[in-house]
């Protein structure tokens, strides 16, 4: 046999279920309460620091965490009754002092956006009750607000609607024309009844005239032109001409000759009026006689007329025609005054006419329509207009007009008139009418649902800063102020697709609040988290909300998402999608949802971020799977890696609580009401994954909730009916419980669970029992776990001799007691836990290409094991040998031939040699540390006798 030796350079590759001969160097059979670290080696997990004892609500609870900043971090719970409780794992009070483990008050009906009026019978938020399982409530923290979503609540609209149409019209004069009648036909839109009017188109005038008050002596005093305004708006001009003629009776005497006047009238029709016909009957007229201002009486007769039909069931407004004389000016005020006077003269119309600038405004309590036979003279705007150019500059404040644009509905929009010095939303009803000059602004369709029902939408938990009243601050349960739809209609600015549906998840992406509802993804307006309506119905902008559908042949219900560099990865139960854009701009015109892959996803869990990749849990079959999604691109499928393959038979099916620390490269997996937590450690150098290791932790109690905040792994653990919050410093913090000694520069973590400091003054010693004791502090709740005390400091009186002293403790009545006199130092009280490593069978191994090949045919007898440790204190080794008793030995990490007085039994580097003298296949090697001191395994060098059993390897 040949004497050989071989080194296993590290044991940081974690647990593997592969056969031992296939394991890579560095993998182990079991790894309990350890953390693989590519730099430090296989280290004992940190002990937990007691944060506080808490009293949660009863029944099923939803747990969540809130991170405000490095000094203010909280854990909260929501009960099925809607009750919320919050505890600070770290916060600063009103005096700036750091406190932890304290309960923070929660108020339900105060502050901006209060929930007042939406509380249940217990005084809690009505929106947050009525759920059963914790996955039915989802949380999202943005800055100092935490949003809570109840997946059982159906989103609805309120009955709040935009103001209904006011029955009104605005008539704007377009031109001022002579001899024109500015007529209006006002009718009931539900009636098709017509009225018939007659208008003269030609007149004749009798040649016989009579006159009075003037002489008839050839002086022609009665001749002249005169415009006659006859009844029913008939207007004509009479031109009376005169020729003096010799009176025949006086012709015999030339000296006494007399002359007489001979008048010849001519008529010119200027406006034919109404109801003038060639045959008078009933209300129609045929002739009109008029005496001029000079006494000439003429008679005109209608010789031609036309018949006019119009819809004017309410009023036929027929003001006098405008003047045709050049010396008479035509003004808009005159025309409008005539129109108003004509309308006011008609009884029982119910119409109020108001002159505004060059416009006439009409209002009626019930619907009416208005048009004009003279469309070139004026424009009429009622509830609709073809374009913005048709709108006047003066109007009633609050009048709404639909701009039709074309026959298509998707280019319609609505404008409201805003009078100068008035505010939109005030004085818009007829009772508080305002008129004047102003501008037209965009508005929603009248009588349109405009408000989301806040009682059916998410609520938020907002922290109120500490004050004299609430020294540690408090949390306010509020309903966000969801902005109303202020433009468009259901076509141009439709309701978000979550209306009438349930919201599964809230996310935050590209400065937008994202809601997942059914197979739809809906985002808010950019930079406005509580607005899900477009800013304008005239066009689409990049800041408008996005509403997209995930099309698939499978039933698609989106449950969660996680942001990656290329977009937002979305998860349904059996497919994954990505929200992304090919443009520099992200908006409704550029956003799209791409299919990524089809893997089952447990929607009761959460996806986790793993730096540049994402991870998710699959819970089909007898064991769960953990997948990593890598190389996530806009186009093409990502690379899916089953990272849990090495522990495929060990990974529990009931894993529902993943949480990650991206900075430390750790993902923790927990199962509710179990004390075991699985962990996956990863580390990459460039494009290469240098470390990916599985390990498991055993907690002192059953796990209720866990999270990672700023390099601290926090757990809520239960024992019986008692609960603790505890923190594990994944990376050493300024307040991490450590041990050091004046004789050494090294500082080591203390490895106890639920640690708390017991001050020297709180410790008493009994000379009779020779035991020290203290009152059992809060949080000592774990049954079946071993209590211990450990002296980690020379404080308060610089007593260095006791540093490193350790004793097991027990509860006696209301006290904790332990052997010896410990009254000289402050000490640490906590629970011991075991660091355990089971190594695989040792084989002679050699490289075969990039793989390691184990020689399983040779004969190998292990003689000695040289364990090279990093920081290590009290350690145990156990060799299980087939057919023989186990060989267990305990070691202190001291060089006994060079040992300083009062030196800690902890070394920064130490080698422990364990004799074996056993065939490799009969040997199982275990390492264990149950002491508060550290344990860090770097490598193993074994020595043994090797024989290839005379076979030549081929």
Predicted regions and their residues:
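Long, charge-dense tracts
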Residues: 138, 145, 165-175, 252-257, ...
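N-terminal beta-propeller domains
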Residues: 1-92, 388-557, 621-637, 879-884, ...
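Beta-sheet repeat architectures centered on beta-propellers
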Residues: 2-71, 622-624, 628-954
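Hydrophobic or amphipathic alpha-helical targeting/insertion segments
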Residues: 93-95, 100, 105, 122-181, ...
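Beta-propeller and closely related beta-pinwheel folds
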Residues: 48-60, 480-511, 516-665, 669-708, ...
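Short linear interaction motifs
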Residues: 56-60, 114-137, 165, 481-504, ...
């Amino acid at each position: 046999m040949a004497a050989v030796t071989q080194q296993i350079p590290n044991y940081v590759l974690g647990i593997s279920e592969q056969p031992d001969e296939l394991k890579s160097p560095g993998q182990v059979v079991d790894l309990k309460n350890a953390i693989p670290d590519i730099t430090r080696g296989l280290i004992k997990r940190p002990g937990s620091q007691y944060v506080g004892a808490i009293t949660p609500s009863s029944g099923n609870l939803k747990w969540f965490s809130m991170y405000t900043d490095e000094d203010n971090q909280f854990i909260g719970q929501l009960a099925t009754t809607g009750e919320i409780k919050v505890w600070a794992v770290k916060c600063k009070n009103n005096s700036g002092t750091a406190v932890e483990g304290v309960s923070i008050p929660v108020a339900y009906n105060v502050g901006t956006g209060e929930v007042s009026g939406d509380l249940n019978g217990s005084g809690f938020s009505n929106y947050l009750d009525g759920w059963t399982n914790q996955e039915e409530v989802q949380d999202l923290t943005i800055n100092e607000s935490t949003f809570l979503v109840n997946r059982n609540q159906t989103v609805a609209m309120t009955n709040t609607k935009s103001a209904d149409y006011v029955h009104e019209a605005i008539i704007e004069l377009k031109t001022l024309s002579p001899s024109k009648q500015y007529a209006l036909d006002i009718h009931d839109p539900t009636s098709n009844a017509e009225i018939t009017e007659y208008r003269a188109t030609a007149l004749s005038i009798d040649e016989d005239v009579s006159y009075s008050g003037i002489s008839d002596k050839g002086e022609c005093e009665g001749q002249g032109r005169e415009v006659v305004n006859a009844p029913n708006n008939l207007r004509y001009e009479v031109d009376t001409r005169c020729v003096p003629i010799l009176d025949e009776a006086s012709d015999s005497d030339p000296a006494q000759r007399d002359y007489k006047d001979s008048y010849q009238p001519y008529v010119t029709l200027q406006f034919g009026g109404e109801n003038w016909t060639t045959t008078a009957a009933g209300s129609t007229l045929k002739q009109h006689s008029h005496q001029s201002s000079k006494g000439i009486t003429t008679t005109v007769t209608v010789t031609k007329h036309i018949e006019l039909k119009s819809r004017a069931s309410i009023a036929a407004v027929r003001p006098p025609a405008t003047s045709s004389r050049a010396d008479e000016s035509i003004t808009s005020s005159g025309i409008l005054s005539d129109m108003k006077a004509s309308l006011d003269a008609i009884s029982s119309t119910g119409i109020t006419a108001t002159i505004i600038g060059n416009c006439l405004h009409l209002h009626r309590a019930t619907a009416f329509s208005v048009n004009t036979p003279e469309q070139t003279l004026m424009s009429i705007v009622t509830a609709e207009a073809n374009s913005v150019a048709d709108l006047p500059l003066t109007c009633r404040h609050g009048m709404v007009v639909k701009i039709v644009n074309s026959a298509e509905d998707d280019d319609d929009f609505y404008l409201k008139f805003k009078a100068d010095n008035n505010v939109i939303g005030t004085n818009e009803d007829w009772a508080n009418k305002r008129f004047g000059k102003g501008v037209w602004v965009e508005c929603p369709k009248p009588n349109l649902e405009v408000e989301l029902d806040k009682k059916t939408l998410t609520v938020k938990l907002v922290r109120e800063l500490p004050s004299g009243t609430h020294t540690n601050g408090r949390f306010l349960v509020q309903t966000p102020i969801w902005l109303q739809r202020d433009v468009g209609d259901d076509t141009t600015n439709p309701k978000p697709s979550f209306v009438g549906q349930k919201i599964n998840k809230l996310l935050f992406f590209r400065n937008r609040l994202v809601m997942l509802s059914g197979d739809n993804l809906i985002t808010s307006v950019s930079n406005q988290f509580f607005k899900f309506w477009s800013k304008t119905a005239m066009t689409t902008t990049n800041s408008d909300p996005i509403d997209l559908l995930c099309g698939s042949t499978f039933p698609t219900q989106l449950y969660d998402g996680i942001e990656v560099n290329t977009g937002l990865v979305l998860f349904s139960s059996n497919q994954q999608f990505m929200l992304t854009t090919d443009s520099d701009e992200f908006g409704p015109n550029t956003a799209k949802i791409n299919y990524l892959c089809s893997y089952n996803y447990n929607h009761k869990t959460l996806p986790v971020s793993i730096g540049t990749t994402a991870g998710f849990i699959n819970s089909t079959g007898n064991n769960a799977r953990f997948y990593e999604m890598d190389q996530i691109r806009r186009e093409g499928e990502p690379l899916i890696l089953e990272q849990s393959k090495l522990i495929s038979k060990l990974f529990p099916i009931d894993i529902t609580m993943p949480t990650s620390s991206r900075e430390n490269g750790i993902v923790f997996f927990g199962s509710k009401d179990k004390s075991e937590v699985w962990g996956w450690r990863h580390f990459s150098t460039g494009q290469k994954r240098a470390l990916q290791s599985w390990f498991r932790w055993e907690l002192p109690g059953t796990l209720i909730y866990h999270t990672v905040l700023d390099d601290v792994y926090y757990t809520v653990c239960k024992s019986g009916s008692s609960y603790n919050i505890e923190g594990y410093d994944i990376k050493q913090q300024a307040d991490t419980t450590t041990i050091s000694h004046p004789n050494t520069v090294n500082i080591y973590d203390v490895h106890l669970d639920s640690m708390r400091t017991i001050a020297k003054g709180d410790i008493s010693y009994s000379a009779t029992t020779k035991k020290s004791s203290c009152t059992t502090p809060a949080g000592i709740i774990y049954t079946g776990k071993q209590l211990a005390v450990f002296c980690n400091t020379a404080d308060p009186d610089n007593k260095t001799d006791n540093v490193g002293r350790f004793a097991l403790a027990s509860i006696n009545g209301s006290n904790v007691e332990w052997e010896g006199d410990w009254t000289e130092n402050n000490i640490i009280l906590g629970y011991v836990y075991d660091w355990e490593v089971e190594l695989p069978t040792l084989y002679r191994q050699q490289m075969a290409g990039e793989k390691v090949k184990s020689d399983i045919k040779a004969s190998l007898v292990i003689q000695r094991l040289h364990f090279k440790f990093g920081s290590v204190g009290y350690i145990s080794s156990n060799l299980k040998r087939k057919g023989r008793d186990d060989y267990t030995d305990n070691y202190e990490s001291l060089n006994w031939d060079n040992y300083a007085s009062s030196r800690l039994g902890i070394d920064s580097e130490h080698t422990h040699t364990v004799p074996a003298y056993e065939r490799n296949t009969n040997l199982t090697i275990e390492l264990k540390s149950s002491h508060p001191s550290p344990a860090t395994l770097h490598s193993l060098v074994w020595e043994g006798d090797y024989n290839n059993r005379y076979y030549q390897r081929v």
